[in-house]
Amino acid sequence: MVCSLLGCVDCAAAQSAPQTGAEAFILMDAGSGRVLTGKNTEQELAIASTTKIMTALVALETGNLSDKVTVKQNHLKEGSSMYLRAGEVLTLEELLYGLLLPSGNDAAECIADHCSGGVERFVARMNEKAAALGMTHTSFANPSGLDTQGHYSCALDMARLAAYAMREPTFARIAATRTAAVGERMLGNHNKLLASLEGCTGLKTGYTDNAGRTLVTCCERDGMRLIAVTLNDRSDWADHAALYEYGFAAFARKRAVARGEEYTLAPVRGGTQASVSLAAGESFFYPVTAGEELLVSARLPEELTAPLTAGQAVGELIVSMDGEELARVSLVCAEPVAAAEKKQSLFERLFDRTG
């Protein structure tokens, strides 16, 4: 059985999406994955040090922040650096700050070697994680992002990676840090939007001769978190600021379904009550523009049979827009319903008395 429960939303006036100087770019809502604007979003390109988003994630999943790591001579790579010295001992957490703030290639090599016993094995884990996240246009060949054959991604994949990474509390904390003291070093974050753009909470810069300037950032205002990615973009700072101004002006985060809110009644057979209230098992938010409508419909059995427990999933809410399904949310019993005691027939009562 399907019934319409409707949701119609109002939003800010329509805005025009900005143009950028990027070879490829995307602006995506982190919560729903909706692409708000973009160009060449699935074009495979070099991504430079934005690679280190994945490096940090794999390190967090395979190592412990308090691990003691000894720097080896072969960890001291070319390019951006946190200026490690062979024989130096740091914690994995300190290396992660060196990885994400000054974009240390030496930190990347050291982390990879420690967490997997070798860079090749670590890179294999990076690719396994990319596959698990649905990054179908991505291939990693090293943990730093230095130009290497077979090392590439696309704007869409990097946005998905960034959205996932920012849900990891330790990653988000480090990515949002402007400066950090690591021993005698004072590390500064290369992401200058942290200081200049309202609501910016991360993420990662990059540059190589082949990739050009690459930038992945995250910005949050009024509960809506957006991710911007630009690849090969000389004007990336200004372009990211313009993308966010567009995104927050043209879209509003609307709650289509509220967790715990009761949506409908369902008949119950064999229970102590004839019906039960059904509520949403979780909330669902979606960014919408002016004139866009979210439709919520319920799918549930014709009849439920007691006993039922509070929180038991018995149906689902379907959220759609313009005929496209966006999400399914469980409908759960808002209260328990016990089974009614079975009434004895006259024959059963007589049998009990004579038996």
Predicted regions and their residues:
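Domain-terminus/edge residues, biased toward the C-terminal soluble/receptor-binding domains
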Residues: T136, D147-Y152, L156-G355
